[in-house]
Amino acid sequence: MIIQRTGAGTQGAVNAVNATHLLLCSLTNAHATALYARKLAESAEGLVTLLPTAAFEDSYQDEDDVCADYLEALLQERDDAAEVLAGGIAYLHAIERFQWFEPDTSDAPLADVAAILATDCFNFAMVGTRKQWRDITYVDVEKRYL
């Protein structure tokens, strides 16, 4: 059995209990997620709520916020979506967001930075379904290709 737990993402998905549809997103599938969410919103006349899940006490923005800003620009079909993304990534570098990542550490390997910032690599949305197993609530995720 493998249990994946991130500090924020999986907890945010489980705690979004009032969501009619649950989509999980990172920069790697932001464009596909925006397209999928827009179709859902149009067909159901629904509202799209973005929930960047990481929270830091000093309230600086992190990659979750950058992803949410980029996703919002894509959802609104703004012409400056690429600039929003570039500005967010520049901000992350300016605040030295990845300064603790090191080449030979398993907790925060330097190689992960490229993966964190990789954008629009996949053409699928990740659709979550809330499930229960005994006393454990979790989100089962399925790829939906566009």
Model-derived regions: residue spans:
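Long, charged alpha-helical interface segments
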Residues: 1, 7, 16, 20-21, ...
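Internal, conserved structured core segments that host functional sites
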Residues: 1-58
